[in-house]
């Protein structure tokens, strides 16, 4: 490993040994420990601001007298990435502290509350005061930073937090493990190892192939043993003390298991675990040396990765030996320094008890058995029905005025509502409310109305575009028929209007009606151009988008503004401008992505099937007259089904048109436009944050999830 260069400082062994550290591996510390400490300070302040439960005053975080945990775990990490991984690790510490005080079931619920904050694509609606929304506010800035810094590695790291940690952590049985294999299974689910390695890769900006990951996996396994055993070794006394004082519900520790299963005293069990730690480190070194000697042409990145694994082992060990997290409990011991429960060599898990979840008794189904009536009575009833005299009223006259079932009405609505959603609207509502502060109940009414309007417009759009798919699923009119779907969509507009009238202010109703007129006006021109095979000029297309797509976003702002007491007309005008820009970005992005892999959810280049003049086509027309002739000729001859509906163009025809658009520069101009709009949106958000005196991480997160940064250029 002499070929490698280091930015970190080597810790002298004699210095490390003063803390009780006994690792056999070299220890290094990041030169910018101040960045990691600053991230911890920010996390503590943010937790107090957004969560406010006082937990930040009781948790021991990453800083220590020998250095920040992150500076020792990622000594070769990029300085600009050290802050974000430090922030996330502090989150892990405070979250683990909470879970140690909970039962397994309650810990799982705590994981569930945190999960949405780590998912940039989460589009569920959360009450502003809910734990989920508090966590989203807490983590939005960090999530944005990770994605913007490195979309690939940042997204992978966040996904590992969400999927590999939250989704499986604490799902293990609460029974005390009896064998090493049992214990290792528990540690792999709640120890966070699956999350740690993506953090190292992100911090160090290393990208490895699947083959390289597989090659180094045995080394990773040895490292995980050393990391876990060291954590258990240095945390054992603290965990016992917390269990016996009621501060924790359970203990999961290899020292406890060795003591319990082998009948050893605590001191003997710790000595055994110490040998296990050194054995795991020796195994890492042996596997490392074997791999290097058998692969003399190994890439420098893979060599770095193997070295960084070892530095994580030693850095973790050193920090554990000195950090306040594992040592401050000592000040709470009894005067003679003894810890209750350590003398008999075992600690019982107070949470290891069975729960009788069976409720005795019968279940009433609510269904009665049919009675056996008299046949004669039934026959008399039939005779009365079919042999009635003219003086008797017909049964039709006697039918009660009962309401019809609403199944036929709501079925298309239910179908469209059940489909996967991009979640932009719900994310945008939460983001705008950071500034507008609409009360939660009122915000729920606005959100419900917007959802109905949006779903109604989707049903009509699919009908008007002859689109067979919506999010990869048959569109509503394909399942329920065009006429029924139109009827259902129209009813949704009426229902949304009634909901606004009955639950919101007159100003909100006025905003809704004005917004609906704008939406229909924009849609009319989109349909007109398609029907008349008339390609609009770029300016006309943007005005249509401002009415159709931007109109929905502007209407949302106006509805929220009507219910917000905080800001005047000038601020609302700024927000409306921001929404119009967002509408342009959103629609043009959708036009561009229709020609990319995203289109698989709707159908490959479906806009061409519909004869739609999307933005890339408009740009191509303005730059290449020859393209105009070819596209118009093909659109004019589009095949139709027996019902008069357009059918798909052949793939070869589509590929030809896409090559023409690419050759004309239509895709390049579209991508250039999108990047300019994204920068403009970022500037507008910054100006609003300055004007309103409040940053809006949720709005920036919303923009980051739509970002075109790193988007592949369409080339044919």
From Swiss-Prot:
Sesterterpenoid synthase: annotated segments:
4-328
Q: Where does substrate bind?
A: 96, 231
Binding positions for Mg(2+) 3 per the UniProt entry: 461, 465
Positions in coiled-coil regions: none
Protein name per UniProt: Fusoxypene synthase
| Superkingdom as given in the UniProt entry | Eukaryota
Q: Where does Mg(2+) 1 bind?
A: 96
């Amino acid at each position: 490993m002499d070929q490698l260069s280091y930015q970190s400082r080597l810790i002298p062994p004699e210095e490390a040994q003063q803390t009780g550290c006994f690792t056999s591996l070299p220890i290094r510390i990041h030169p910018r420990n101040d960045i990691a400490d600053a991230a911890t300070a920010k996390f503590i302040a943010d937790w107090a601001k957004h969560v406010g439960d006082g937990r930040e005053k009781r948790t021991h975080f990453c800083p220590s007298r020998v250095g920040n945990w992150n500076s020792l775990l990622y000594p070769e990490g990029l300085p600009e990435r050290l802050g974000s991984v430090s922030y996330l690790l502090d989150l892990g510490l405070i979250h683990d502290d909470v879970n140690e005080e909970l039962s397994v079931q309650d810990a799982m619920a705590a994981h569930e509350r945190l999960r949405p904050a780590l998912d940039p694509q989460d589009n569920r609606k959360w009450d502003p005061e809910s734990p989920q929304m508090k966590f989203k506010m807490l983590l939005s800035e960090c999530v944005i930073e990770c994605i913007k810094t490195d979309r690939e590695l940042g997204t992978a790291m966040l996904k590992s937090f969400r999927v590999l940690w939250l989704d499986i952590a604490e799902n293990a049985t609460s029974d005390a493990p009896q064998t090493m294999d049992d214990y290792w299974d528990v540690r792999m689910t709640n120890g966070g190892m699956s999350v740690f390695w993506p953090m190292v890769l992100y911090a160090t900006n290393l990208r490895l192939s699947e083959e390289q990951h597989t090659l180094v996996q045995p080394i990773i396994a040895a490292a995980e043993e050393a990391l876990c055993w060291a954590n258990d070794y240095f945390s054992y006394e603290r965990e016992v003390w917390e269990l016996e004082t009621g501060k924790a519900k359970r203990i999961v520790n290899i020292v406890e298991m060795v003591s319990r299963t082998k009948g050893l005293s605590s001191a003997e069990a710790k000595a055994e675990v110490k040998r296990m730690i050194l054995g795991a480190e020796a195994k890492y070194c042996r596997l490392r040396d074997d791999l290097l000697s058998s692969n003399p042409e190994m890439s420098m990145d893979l060599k770095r990765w193997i070295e960084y694994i070892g530095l994580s082992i030693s850095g973790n060990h050193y920090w554990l030996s000195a950090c306040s997290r594992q040592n401050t409990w000592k000040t709470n011991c009894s005067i003679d320094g003894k810890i209750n429960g350590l003398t008999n060599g075992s600690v019982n898990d107070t949470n290891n008890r069975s729960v009788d979840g069976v409720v005795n008794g019968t279940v009433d189904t609510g269904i009665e058995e049919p009675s056996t009536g008299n046949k004669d009575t039934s026959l008399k009833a039939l005779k009365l029905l079919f042999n009635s005299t003219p003086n008797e009223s017909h049964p039709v006259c006697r039918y009660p005025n009962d309401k019809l079932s609403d199944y036929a009405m709501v079925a298309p609505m239910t179908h469209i509502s059940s489909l996967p959603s991009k979640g932009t609207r719900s994310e945008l509502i939460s983001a705008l409310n950071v500034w507008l502060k609409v009360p939660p109940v009122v915000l729920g009414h606005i959100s419900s109305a917007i959802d109905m309007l949006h779903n109604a417009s989707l049903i009509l759009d699919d009908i008007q575009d002859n689109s067979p798919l919506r999010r990869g699923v048959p569109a509503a009119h394909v399942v329920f028929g065009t006429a029924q779907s139109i009827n259902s969509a129209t009813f949704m507009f009426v229902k949304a209007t009634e909901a606004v009238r009955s639950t919101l202010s007159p100003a909100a109703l006025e905003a809704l009606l004005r917004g609906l007129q704008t939406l229909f006006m924009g849609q009319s021109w989109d349909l007109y151009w398609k029907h008349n095979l008339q390609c609009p000029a770029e300016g006309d297309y943007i005005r249509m988008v401002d009415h159709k797509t931007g109109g929905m976003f502007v209407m949302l702002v106006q509805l929220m503004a009507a219910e917000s007491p905080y800001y005047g007309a000038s601020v609302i005008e700024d927000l409306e401008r921001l929404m119009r820009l967002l509408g342009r970005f959103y629609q043009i992005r959708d036009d561009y992505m229709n020609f990319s892999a995203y289109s698989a959810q709707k159908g490959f280049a479906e806009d061409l099937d519909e004869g739609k003049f999307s933005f890339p086509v408009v740009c191509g027309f303005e730059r290449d007259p020859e393209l105009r002739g070819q596209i118009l000729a093909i659109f004019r001859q589009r095949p139709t089904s027996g019902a008069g509906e357009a059918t798909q163009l052949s793939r070869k025809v589509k590929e030809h048109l896409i090559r023409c658009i690419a050759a004309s520069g239509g895709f390049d101009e579209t991508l250039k436009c999108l990047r300019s709009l994204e920068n403009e949106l970022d500037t507008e958000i910054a100006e609003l944050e300055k004007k309103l005196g409040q940053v809006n991480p949720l709005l920036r997160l919303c923009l980051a999830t739509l970002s075109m940064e790193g988007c592949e250029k369409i080339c044919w």
